[in-house]
């Protein structure tokens, strides 16, 4: 299970790196992972300060932490 969470976290990071900020439902659809794996992967990335979640109306938006985005471009 940990490997699946890590793989999903990697997919999330790659999509956000390529597309920028997305709504949580849109990101989940693009990743194609099911709950709770997707939720655990987002939590892992947030805990590691890799992503930032912001409240937007009735949902959340997620983006890479600016430091992470700079690292990707280096």
Residues covered by each model-derived region:
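A short, conserved structural fragment
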Residues: 46-56
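Short acidic, hydrophobic short linear motifs in intrinsically disordered regions
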Residues: 18-30
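Catalytic cores of transferase enzymes with a strong primary signal for eukaryotic protein kinases
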Residues: 28, 41, 50
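Short amphipathic alpha-helical interaction segments
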Residues: 33-44
């Amino acid at each position: 299970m940990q490997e699946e969470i890590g793989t999903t976290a990697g997919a999330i990071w790659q999509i956000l790196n390529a597309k920028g900020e997305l709504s949580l439902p849109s990101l989940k659809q693009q990743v194609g992972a099911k709950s709770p794996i997707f939720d655990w992967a987002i939590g892992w990335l947030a805990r590691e300060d890799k992503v930032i979640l912001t409240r937007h109306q009735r949902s959340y938006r997620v983006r890479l932490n600016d430091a992470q985005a700079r690292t990707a471009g280096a």
